[in-house]
């Protein structure tokens, strides 16, 4: 009887031009991830060269029939969330990388693309919630084992370089559609402008059934929406957050 191969799980940070990611997967799947990101980025860059408006618009973009898959996914997700297509770029690239690793045989694969996480996990994993200078710290979501990809995406007006029209310390959205989780997190963050807005910021998600849960944090206040994984205590190490150096 042949003994199954045993691989060492590897955590590594990579930068591919503007894409800065952390990858957690068995070591043989890391090249699969990187090859996919190079390919997908190339397709996206070629499309942007053809129509620079795609990169700059903050409104949903009408997708041409001949657009590559990465562009089609971004357009579909952001049309539902009411934001520009680049609001879904990180989640879409991360998802396509995890899809490729899973297709190659990975049972556990996670890509954190600047706070937008795509994962498939054959064991429980805790995803930390980082809300910058907010006093709400040390919390995470315990994701149970699953054999399909999940998106856990976070937008913030106070952490990182992403555009936000709100003031949230964290706007987190969960969906099986990672592109949609990314787009909806941006849209949620835009709506969290003050503590009072937490009461209504989630209302638009009622029209997006693919979103299963969300968290909004501003200052010392937190609100939740939908069905969330178990919220647990977690040590959120700032140095492990995917970001530029």
Swiss-Prot record:
Gene3D superfamilies named among the record's database cross-references: ApbE-like domains (3.10.520.10)
Entry superkingdom: Archaea
UniProt similarity note: Belongs to the UPF0280 family.
Protein name: UPF0280 protein UNCMA_16740
Protein source organism: Methanocella arvoryzae (strain DSM 22066 / NBRC 105507 / MRE50)
């Amino acid at each position: 009887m042949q003994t199954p191969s045993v691989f060492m799980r590897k955590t590594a940070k990579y930068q591919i031009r503007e894409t800065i990611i952390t990858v957690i997967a068995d070591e043989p799947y890391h090249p699969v991830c990187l090859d996919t990101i190079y390919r997908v980025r190339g397709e996206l860059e070629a499309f942007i060269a053809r129509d620079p408006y795609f990169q700059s618009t903050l409104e949903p973009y009408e997708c041409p029939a001949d657009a590559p898959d990465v562009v089609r996914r971004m357009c579909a997700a952001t049309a539902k969330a009411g934001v520009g297509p680049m609001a879904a770029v990180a989640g879409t690239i991360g998802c396509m990388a995890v899809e490729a690793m899973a297709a190659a045989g990975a049972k556990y694969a996670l890509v954190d693309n600047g706070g937008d996480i795509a994962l498939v996990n054959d064991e429980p994993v805790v995803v930390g919630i980082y809300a910058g200078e907010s006093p709400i710290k040390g919390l995470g979501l315990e994701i149970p084992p699953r054999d399909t990809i999940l998106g856990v995406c976070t937008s913030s007006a106070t952490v990182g370089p992403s555009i936000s029209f709100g003031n949230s310390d964290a706007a987190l959205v969960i969906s099986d559609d990672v592109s949609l989780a990314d787009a909806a997190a941006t849209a949620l963050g835009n709506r969290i402008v003050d503590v009072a807005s937490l009461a209504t910021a989630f209302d638009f998600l009622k029209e997006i059934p693919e979103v299963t849960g969300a968290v909004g944090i501003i200052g010392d206040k937190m609100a939740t929406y939908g069905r969330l994984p178990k919220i647990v205590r977690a040590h959120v190490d700032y140095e492990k957050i995917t970001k530029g150096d």
